[in-house]
Each structure stands twice: as C-alpha cells, then as structure tokens.
Amino acid sequence: SLIDAFKVIDTARGNTTLTYFEFATLAAFYIFSKQNLDFALLEVGLGGRLDATNIIDSDLSIITSIGIDHTEFLGSTIDSIANEKAGVMRPFCYSIFAGANPPATLLSTAQSNNISFIFGHNHFSHNIYNNYWKWRGMHGTQLKLPLMPLTGDFQYNHASAALQAIEI
C-alpha cells in the first residue's frame, strides 16, 4: 500500500531531506518495484534534468512541447527550457518531440549523444477531419481514429507522439 511505501522511504532516507514530490515519487517507484511490470509510463513533474523521475534510465522519452513557463526553475528562454527538458533524453535510446519544430538544443543533444530523435510532421503525422482523425507512424502504420473530446491541435500532437512511442 501507499502508506507502507511511505514508511519504507521514510526509513531509507535517514537524515536526507526530500520534497513531497521526491518522497511520493520514490514511494511510487518502490511500489512499482514490487510489481511484475512490463513497462512503466512516467511523467516528469517539472522540466526534466533535475526532476525526481529522472533517476530512472528510460528506454524512450517524449517531450510534448516547450514553452515559456516555470521560468524561475527552467530559465527564461526557449533554449534554456529545452536544455532542461533534454535532460530526460538518454544515449542510444529513442526520444520523441511531439511538435513539428524542435528547438536546436534538442537536435544537438540528440546528435551528440547518439539519440534516435523523432519529431512530428517529419517522422510521424496526423490529419484532423470532420468526424475522425488519421495518424501515420514512421514505420508505415496508419490509424483512423475517432475525434477526441479535448480541444486544441496540441492534444493531437501529444496523442500522435504517444502512438509513435507504441509503434516503436
């Protein structure tokens, strides 16, 4: 149970101070470790490079978007924020950017670390029609899907990136 996991983390941390997010993340990882999981899908809380979830070596990462937010933690430019988010990318693994125009920082991080970098409208794409949307993956998979009840084209970008991760 979650309470048992919190007790284990509290004992293991000793005198180390943890934020609530770090504490809860470690408790979740403890619970995951006791399960027979085929995979785990983790969402970074803030940024990437210094996020508590980043202690896990992932096989694949998805960066949904990069915008000017959380500037007090991530920096005030797209480049500085992209650098923080690039911290989730791993050498010799896949990294997916949901948008069509990845910042140069992501491209250079991928190139210098042997990361298979995939991004929207170059490697995978989607089209929205009146009653459905279509997705095309980098390996030729095509899907006709019902429209989502969520508004905004970015929702389709994010869903497309998730489908690309599944296709890989």
Language model features by range: what are they?
Residues 1, 58, 154-157:
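A generic short alpha-helical patch detector that favors 3-5-residue windows
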Residues 1-56, 72, 80:
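ATP-dependent carboxylate-amine ligase catalytic core
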Residues 13-18, 147-153:
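A short glycine/serine-rich beta->alpha loop
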Residues 16, 35-43, 58-145, 159, ...:
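Acidic, Mg2+-coordinating active-site environments of NTP-dependent enzymes
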Residues 21, 95-99, 151:
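Glycine- and other small-residue-rich loops at beta-strand/loop junctions that grip anionic moieties
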Residues 50-53, 85, 153:
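A generic local secondary-structure boundary/capping motif
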Residues 150-162:
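Short glycine/threonine-rich catalytic loop with a Thr-x-Gly-x-Asp
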